[in-house]
Amino acid sequence: MKTGIRLTAAVLISLFVISAAGCTNEKSLSSETSGHTNSPQTPPAAADILKKAALSREEQISLYKEIVEGETAWLASLQLDNGALPMTYAADGKLTLNPYFSDFAALAMLESDKYFGQVKKYADWHFSHLNTADTDYNGLDGTVYDYTAEVSGGKVKRETVNTDNGKKHYDSVDSYAATFLCVLEKYCRKSGDAEYIKQNGADIDRVTAALLATFEGELTTTKPDYKIQYLMDNCEVYEGLAAAEKLYKSAFADKKELIGKITAAKEKVSNGIENLLWNKKGYYETAISPDGTVAYKFAWSDFYPCATSQLFMISSGLLKPESERARQLYKSFNDNFSTGEKKSSWEKISLPDSFFWGSVVYAAAIMGDEGRVESYMRLYKKAMKNHAYPLYNADAGRVCLAAAVMIEKLSQKG
């Protein structure tokens, strides 16, 4: 933890950042906001929110297909011989293995049918690294640590668990479990390999149990020794539970009691986000303590975590892109970070830090913001010929997922 802000959220989103394509969200309590009330009374006009593309529909589709092909190939090239998907690549030296980051890489790789085998190999790595109650420093079964891999000649020579102040480390339990469940559901759906899922049913149960164990009231806490309830984490938890619900109904239909628990938890976290995090001033609280105390003062001018966390409501599926509230949140975000000014123009990849923030373009793609997404993607494609720092696997994964969303939307328009 860094100064009270989740490293995963800060680094994950930024180094890249949740809500994986393929994790569908079915909860809908109203036609406008998927169960979220207190929306602004006057919705902003569409012209105030979305920008038109400069390229033709066909040119946009071509651009996004190139990005999907290029990013999936690069992400696949990162994979180590033991199946791990490191944040970056080096033939020799030390590489960070962050399972949460790796999940976004895997989700992106599943946009191509070329890499099903490699995603399966990554899932094998993840399953083999699940902690037991004895090996987890919080005594919780089904979690997974961050690791460092030492490689030589492109081969893994050793893996060691990362530590923080002398303790073995994972940044969270809730998000790590949720995003991995998204990977498994998407792998099963895209590849059709239900047999692999069934073979690993016991371990999937463990991951699901770890996720459910993080609930305190209507929301999840980051991990047992860091009891903060983050908007971003809980959006990802909603996605993960929606994915788990679909996965279990497809591959483990006989586990009716567990399916019922998953469905109830999905509804609980959706309601909890609305009941406990929505502020009538027009935003969701970034984080609270289990007693309801606000843990981080909100300001739209604070790019991370305040402003970016609002977009997770869109990318997670908790808000429909056409809903009044999604449009208002997206407009407020762009009022602050699509200004045309340096360090506050995300579509020009000009932001307060040096990272690519794939989570932002992913939310923009879901909103159907053709103009801003096109601007971002053209710059990204030009900058990423060598996939050099500060690009990380999860950021590239998010960009790829955004491109895939745009291909689908533009194809439907045809």
Where are these regions (language model features)?
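Sec-dependent signal peptide cleavage junction
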Residues: I18-H36
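Aromatic-rich carbohydrate-recognition surfaces in CAZymes
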Residues: G93-L211, L231-N234, V373, M377, ...
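Well-ordered alpha-helical scaffold segments within catalytic/enzyme domains
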Residues: A46-I61, F101-F116, H169, A178-Y196, ...
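Active-site core of glycosidic bond-cleaving carbohydrate-active enzymes
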Residues: E66, N98-F104, A108, S112-G117, ...
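Extended ligand-binding clefts on enzyme/binding-domain cores
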Residues: S62-T72, L80, A84-T88, G93-Y100, ...
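Bacterial N-terminal signal peptides that target proteins for export
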Residues: M1-A9
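Hydrophobic core
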Residues: L12, F16-V17
